[in-house]
A protein has these predicted regions:
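Glycine-rich adenosine-cofactor-binding loop
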Residues: 129-149
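Residue-level marker of beta-strand positions
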Residues: 3, 56-58, 76, 88, ...
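Glycine-rich beta-strand-centered segment in the early N-terminal region that forms part
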Residues: 18-35, 42-83, 100
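NAD(P)H dinucleotide-binding glycine-rich loop of Rossmann-like/cofactor-binding domains
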Residues: 33, 77-135
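C-terminal substrate-binding/catalytic core of Rossmann-like NAD(P)-dependent dehydrogenases/reductases
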Residues: 197-206, 248-298, 307-308
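Adenosine-nucleotide cofactor-binding segment
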Residues: 134, 149-226
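ADP-ribose/adenylate-binding Rossmann-like module
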Residues: 231-249, 265
Length: 316
């Protein structure tokens, strides 16, 4: 079978490898699609020879181990697991779920969806009608906007430097869309905006708490995006960090963050079985039409185009 294997930084090739072996308690799955995750862009750019990537697979059960229950050959499945950039993978039934009949394969890649649902849980509780901003409107940001709409948030402010991303944000439920340089001043609480307000006469903090937004979610994965998200959070607000910051250290104004006394929430999830439990919920929400987040895929690449796909992701 074929597999994408790295040859070094930014360079891969498709090679022939043996079919994977699976036990009586595992599934052998023929992969139809594997989603590209921005968390793997930096590792791709500095990869060592022999490294493999891919953790967002969807496919069809080719064979089921004799002890496996609930799955059979021909079932469409998705779930959690690595090494997905190859024709066949081995999956653990505990971390695998069925794809509903009314969902396309490309809409049912569940790993990032489970990450989004975990983010929504960590940003709770939310009172219906609460405002929130989403900084970074790529795939994850758009999914978060649509999920926040389902959760009952009111004003949803989308922020991105790409006009086309803001158009997509409107499609998935954003009520306001802003380029970074065009954000209304009342949504920003930093040293500059505070310097324009006489806070010495603000003994009860009414002026201070009128600035910024109480809930902000960051999905840029960049230092500039994270700093901007921090500027948007109101005093005693909440900042959810969903962007994957794995390329270098971040230089942040923690003096400002400290003064604003907001809560910073790491929205990533490392409890594999907990995340696995969210997977079927995500697909059920999509299948029922409650979570309106389908038809997002805009590029499908061959295995031979893996490097091109990463280069295009880098450009955006």
């Amino acid at each position: 079978m074929k597999q994408i294997v790295m040859q070094g930084p930014r360079k891969s090739r498709v090679v022939e490898v043996p079919m994977p072996e699976f036990t009586d308690d595992q599934l052998l799955v023929k992969v139809t699609y594997t989603g590209m995750c921005h968390s793997e862009w930096y590792p791709w750019s500095v990869a060592k020879e022999g490294e493999v990537f891919g953790h967002e697979a969807v496919g069809v059960v080719a064979e089921a181990g004799r002890n496996v229950q609930g799955f059979k050959p021909g079932d469409r499945v998705t779930g959690l697991g690595g090494g997905g950039y190859k024709e066949y993978i081995v999956m653990d039934p505990v971390k695998t779920c069925h794809v509903p009949d009314n969902l396309k394969d490309e809409d049912a890649i569940v790993e990032p969806l489970a990450c989004l649902l975990s983010c929504a849980v960590k940003m709770m509780p939310a009172t219906p009608g609460d405002p929130i901003a989403v900084v970074g409107c790529g795939y994850m940001g758009l999914g978060m906007i649509s999920l926040f709409r389902l959760c009952g948030y009111g004003k949803i402010v989308a922020v991105d430097k790409r006009p086309e991303a803001l158009e997509n944000a409107k499609r998935f439920g954003a009520t306001e869309c802003c380029l970074p340089g065009e954000i209304p001043s009342e949504y920003i609480l930093n040293w500059e905006t505070m310097g324009k307000v006489d806070l010495t006469r603000d003994s009860n903090n009414e002026k201070l708490f009128a600035m910024g937004l109480p809930n902000v979610m960051e999905f840029t994965g960049t230092e500039d995006g994270l700093r901007l998200a921090g500027d948007l959070v109101s005093a005693h607000g909440r900042l959810g960090i969903g962007g994957y910051h794995n390329d270098s250290f971040r230089n942040l104004d923690y003096k400002l963050w400290n003064f604003k006394a907001f809560t910073s929430i790491n929205c990533h999830e490392r409890r594999v079985l907990y995340e696995a439990g969210l997977c079927q919920r995500c697909l059920d929400l999509l299948s029922s039409g409650l979570w309106k987040f389908t038809g997002v895929t805009d590029h499908i690449y061959s295995m031979e185009e893996f490097d091109k796909a990463n280069e295009e992701m880098e450009a955006h």
